[in-house]
A protein has these predicted regions:
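Central hydrophobic cores of alpha-helical transmembrane segments
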Residues: 371-381
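Structural signal for the C-terminal ends of transmembrane alpha-helices
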Residues: 101-105, 179-181, 279-287, 359-365, ...
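Hydrophobic alpha-helical transmembrane segments
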Residues: 87-95, 348-357, 423-424
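Long, contiguous internal "core" modules enriched in hydrophobic/ aromatic residues
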Residues: 30-57, 148-349, 445, 463-468
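Transmembrane-helix bundle segments that line or gate the permeation/cavity pathway
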Residues: 2-18, 58-69, 73-76, 83-214, ...
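C-terminal TM-helix exit segments that contain a strictly Trp-centered aromatic cap at the helix terminus
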Residues: 53-60, 127-137, 314-321, 382-393
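Extramembrane terminal tails and long inter-domain/linker segments of multi-pass membrane proteins
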Residues: 1-38, 141-157, 186-222, 294-295, ...
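Extended C-terminal subregions enriched in glycine
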Residues: 344-369
């Protein structure tokens, strides 16, 4: 992680003439200072949405699943759509933290902390949906293989839904440990700057006695690499297992082998879009434009563009395989998606996920903050509709025409979904006021190689050296 030479053509990752002390002050300011008006506005809206969603959840649990728009044919709808959408959003955090760490990508330094927090908070939202969907959430622990005295009660290890339980719990625990490990030097920094004894005690407990000695740093880097190695397979395996919820069934439109890679690409695609959405808001609210630069936004836009193209290829491959299979029911399932009663959701998905990311080929657009923000939201709207199309359009047309039906969401469906978005932002905003949103210790390691003033000095030194010769 030591500083090394960087080509002058590379744009700086820290702009403004920043010293090590400036980095500490800038990162600690949102935690130590008072919340501004923008923070309170966003927090109030998020809290109102969360409370509405909480009311809808309580109503569902006390009344029953009949409060949703489910019917005799469409037994899975918005609940599983939202579950898959939230799990997918979490993938970018692990990819930025683990995969880009192993590839030694310096641009991850400023964005990894918030991306990891986003992973944890989105997995928490995802976990709510299967629990509510049980109908009797107080029996939720029955999905865990806990030895019991209930007679023949035991989990079915052949069920993809049980695989989900293991995948999500492993993902959440590894992400939490990874995130916390990265936070240790930053908690220690806040502990040393704390003014009140209570704050000092809290951050002292959270920092696990971090002293900043060489031995601490050595162990920190070793643990980071080990956790990155553990988390990298999780990026691929978690959404693969989520796709098995569909791929291991026999329903036309679900029973296809392309789903695992297609889901993983879609997860990274939607995750990076959400990271972009959050960081563009946060760099403004927390005054962190010098650390989350246009260069960071551009690099994430390039990832969105590439994964969007992969998702587009997956859509076309899916259509080709349905045609090539010669199975009439498979062909009908895909034809019905594009031309049936839900045609609008299919074409909305295609427009948002395949066409909109292609505008990123233009450097002018991918370096424009407002355009990036709009496209990142459009992409996540498209990815929600992708899950809706996969789930609802495959179910609403059965082998028996007498079972054909339409799905109509109720206010409870919408309320729970909006409530989880509100809950996510409540958690994220509270995190941004309690924890450092940028890994200041890691940003300092690239300051001399990628800092604005250091690069300028080195370039000037290079010119002087060549003039002397």
């Amino acid at each position: 992680m030591s500083s090394h030479y960087e080509a002058p053509i590379r744009k700086p990752l820290v702009v403004g003439s920043k010293s090590y002390h400036d980095v500490t002050v800038d990162v600690a300011r949102p935690v130590e200072g008072r919340a501004n008006k923008q923070w309170w506005t966003v927090f109030s809206i998020a809290l109102a949405a969360f409370l509405w969603g909480l009311g809808c959840m309580i109503y569902t649990v006390t009344t029953g699943i009949g409060t949703w728009g489910l019917n005799k044919t469409v037994g899975w709808a918005w609940d599983i759509t939202n579950f898959v959408w939230w799990v997918g959003i979490g993938h970018a955090g692990t990819l930025i933290s683990a995969v880009l760490l192993l590839f030694r990508q310096k641009w991850r330094m400023a964005i990894n902390r918030s991306a990891e927090a986003m992973t944890i908070f989105s997995v928490m939202q995802a976990g709510l949906f299967p629990i509510i969907h049980m109908g009797r959430p107080w029996l939720g622990y029955w999905v865990l293989p806990i030895p019991n005295q209930f007679g023949s009660l035991w989990v079915n290890f052949n069920s993809p839904l049980l695989w989900d339980v293991f995948a999500i719990s492993t993902y959440l625990s590894v992400s939490l440990v990874f995130w916390w490990t990265g936070l240790l030097p930053d908690f220690a920094m806040l502990r040393d700057r704390a003014v009140t004894p209570f704050t000092k005690r809290v951050y002292s407990t959270l920092s696990f006695g971090w002293s900043g000695r060489a031995k601490d740093w050595q162990r920190f880097e070793e643990v980071s690499l080990v956790l990155a190695g553990l988390a990298t397979p999780l990026v691929l395996s978690v959404h693969t297992i989520v796709s098995f919820d569909f791929a291991t069934s026999v329903i036309p439109g679900w029973h296809t082998t392309i789903l695992p890679p297609y889901f993983v690409a879609g997860a990274i695609f939607s995750g990076f879009a959400m990271v972009n959405t959050l960081l563009i808001i946060m760099r403004k609210v927390s005054n962190l434009e010098d650390y989350i630069t246009v260069q960071h936004i551009e690099l994430m836009n390039i990832v969105i563009m590439i994964t969007g193209s992969i998702v587009g290829c997956a859509y076309i491959t899916e259509l080709f395989v349905a045609w090539y299979s010669g199975v009439e029911y498979e062909q009908y399932a895909f034809l019905n998606r594009a031309t049936g009663p839900y045609w609008w959701s299919y074409w909305l998905m295609m427009t948002c996920n395949v066409i909109s990311p292609q505008v990123m080929w233009s450097k002018k657009i991918r370096t424009n903050i407002m355009a990036s923000f709009i496209i990142s939201i459009v992409v996540n709207v498209g990815m929600w509709f992708e899950r809706f199309v996969i789930i609802v359009t495959s179910l609403h047309r059965d082998y028996l025409p007498s079972s054909w039906t339409m799905f109509q969401p109720t206010f409870v469906d919408a309320g729970i979904y909006i409530g989880t978005i509100g809950f996510f932002f409540v958690l994220f905003l509270l995190y941004s006021r309690s924890f450092p949103v940028i890994a200041q210790a890691e940003v300092k390691t690239i300051l001399k190689s990628s800092g604005d003033n250091y690069k300028a000095e080195r370039e000037q030194h290079g010119h002087n050296h060549s003039d002397n010769h």
